[in-house]
A protein has these predicted regions:
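Flexible, small-/acidic-enriched active-site or ligand-binding loops
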Residues: 39-68
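Glycine-rich phosphate/pyrophosphate-binding beta-alpha loops
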Residues: 9-15, 54, 89-93
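Long, acidic (Asp/Glu-rich), low-complexity accessory segments flanking structured domains
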Residues: 62-82
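Residue-level preference for beta-strand/loop junctions
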Residues: 16-18, 56, 127, 163
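A short core secondary-structure module
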Residues: 5-45
């Protein structure tokens, strides 16, 4: 078995997950991945309250106090390739999540502009409102195209972490 001590901060859905993939250094100073069952003695979770953003999901601190993980729960990957692969996949997912939220905001803005009456006509008929809606839709479409392109690169195993970071940053 391996013994984990320490904590991991800002873990998305840490408070609801039944297990955690945890990356830690072993006695040889190599980074290893472990599958940690939530019921293991020495493993606890503290939810982080009063966040300024990302309120749609639970964010937690994972706490390990002499948590004994069976050797069979250690992943085969050694080094940073494993955690960075997980992080890149999460970043890619975040880019699509942001696009979904953006599209919902655009739909609300468009509907509002069609129903909000000012000077006896919908504000959607005003040129400045139309320009703002067009700019919103254009930015969303550009984000979708970027995320789609990165997804195709990922399918061919050609996506660089910079591509994925760009998709997250721009979306």
């Amino acid at each position: 078995h391996y013994v984990l001590n320490g904590s991991k901060m800002w873990i998305t859905n840490g408070g609801v997950a039944g297990l955690a993939i945890v990356w830690a250094k072993d006695d040889e100073n190599k980074i290893r991945g472990f599958i940690v069952d939530r019921d293991l003695k020495g493993f606890s979770v503290r939810n982080i309250e009063k966040k300024f953003s990302l309120k749609a999901s639970v964010t937690s601190e994972l706490i390990f106090e002499d948590c004994r993980v069976p050797a069979s729960q250690m992943l085969e990957v050694v080094g940073l390739k494993g955690p960075f692969s997980c992080l890149n996949n999460a970043r890619f997912g975040i880019s699509w999540g942001a696009l979904g939220a953006s599209m919902a905001c655009y739909d609300e803005a468009l509907n509002y502009s069609k129903t909000r009456i000012q000077f006896d006509k919908p504000i959607a008929s005003f040129q400045l409102v139309q320009a703002k809606l067009v700019e919103m839709f254009t930015d969303i479409t550009l984000g979708q195209l970027l995320a789609l392109h990165v997804g195709r690169l990922k399918d061919k195993d050609q996506a660089d972490p910079a591509h994925i970071s760009m998709a997250k940053m721009k979306n």
